């Protein structure tokens, strides 16, 4: 009978205690009893606010980059899903805001980066915002850990092997295993990507599909038959000093 004990705990006391716990411990605490579950289920509570303000870079909190994640808890989750500084080309670095990659101006090189967390189960969506010039090739999509993150020349690195799947925003082509898989989206005179637009990437690990959405318009399924492997948000770029941000949103909303 934990509930009666929990009920005796002052709200402020719980708030202080939970503020000092690690995020993994908070997840365990939410399973202790209904009172603690409801307490932590408030994604804008002072507990999540405290963790958000103490873990997220101030640069990210001050910008409108996280406008699509409205609560402290979802902002925190997005941060832990952002680009990995340890899983990117040597010509790429992650900016102080934690969400934006910067490609250094290295000649005759194509460079890629993966997110910190990959997915093998469930449905997931994230936003990609290309905040600099696209250059001759700019690809967004997914890859396994086996996919290369750097190569010589200016090429569509993402989608160049059997471990990656990508959409080249410059030519509106789908790429996988080194082959052009068709035009995308399947529209007559499909508009080209404009720098700064937010594209939502939708990975469905249950149906094994990858889809995209732009300006809240579903563009259709891009890839089917994805493998039963852990798949990571990935981009590859060729333009010097270009920047790309990625914000994890969670489970996609149907409709």
Curated annotation (Swiss-Prot):
InterPro entries named among the record's database cross-references: B30.2/SPRY, B30.2/SPRY_sf, ConA-like_dom_sf, F-box-like_dom_sf, F-box_dom, FBXO45-Fsn/SPSB_families, SPRY_dom, SPRY_FBXO45
Protein biosynthesis is among the record's keywords: no
Annotated SUPFAM superfamilies: Concanavalin A-like lectins/glucanases, F-box domain
UniProt domain B30.2/SPRY: residue ranges: 61-253
Chief subcellular location: other
PROSITE patterns: B302_SPRY (PS50188)
Pathway(s) the chain acts in: Protein modification; protein ubiquitination
Residue ranges annotated for the F-box domain, each copy included: 3-51
Keywords from the named record: Neurogenesis, Synapse, Ubl conjugation pathway
Tree of life domain: Eukaryota
Xref: SMART domains: SPRY
Assigned GO CC terms: cell cortex; neuromuscular junction; nucleus; pole plasm; SCF ubiquitin ligase complex
Quaternary structure and partners: Component of an E3 ubiquitin ligase complex composed of hiw and Fsn.
Family: Belongs to the FBXO45/Fsn family.
Function: Required in the presynaptic motoneuron to down-regulate the levels of wnd and restrain synaptic terminal growth at the neuromuscular junction (NMJ).
Protein name: F-box/SPRY domain-containing protein 1
Organism, scientific name: Drosophila erecta
